Amino acid sequence: MTVFAATTEQVPNREIHGVTYTFITLTGSKFFGYDAVAVDAHRVNVASVEKTLADCADHLEHCDGITELAKGLAATDLDGETLTEYLMRLENGAAIKRIVYLADLLNVELAQREKLVDAFTSGYSKLDPIRGDEGQHMSEYRLLLNVP
């Protein structure tokens, strides 16, 4: 099992009790959406559901691809306003396109959907950047649907 942890400083990856911890270095502008929680005698920051989904859409390689993002979006009771805010703050048009497409596909209501659509970048983005270039272009979302 691999656990991904975000930090603003470079930290070497490590394995503890058979669990691999991979540290992702974020710029300060992308380090938001966390709540401080107590774990034993330590305080750690844990990402909100909305931040987790936004980060997954931003970097699908850290969440095992588009299928896991879809599962998370479908199974989660989320705050649509917060998700919209976080997606806008990430400033990643591809991430926004992925979330809007999946939300429409899964009948998940997004707060401020039109604001997100207005933030689509002009080029086509891969639905899943981990996969190849084969697939159908969907102009409504400016996405290459490269998932079978």
Annotated model-derived regions:
Residues F32-P148:
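Hydrophobic alpha-helical interaction segments
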Residues M1-D35, E140:
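Short gly/ser-rich loop at a beta-strand->alpha-helix junction or flexible surface loop bordering the NTP-binding
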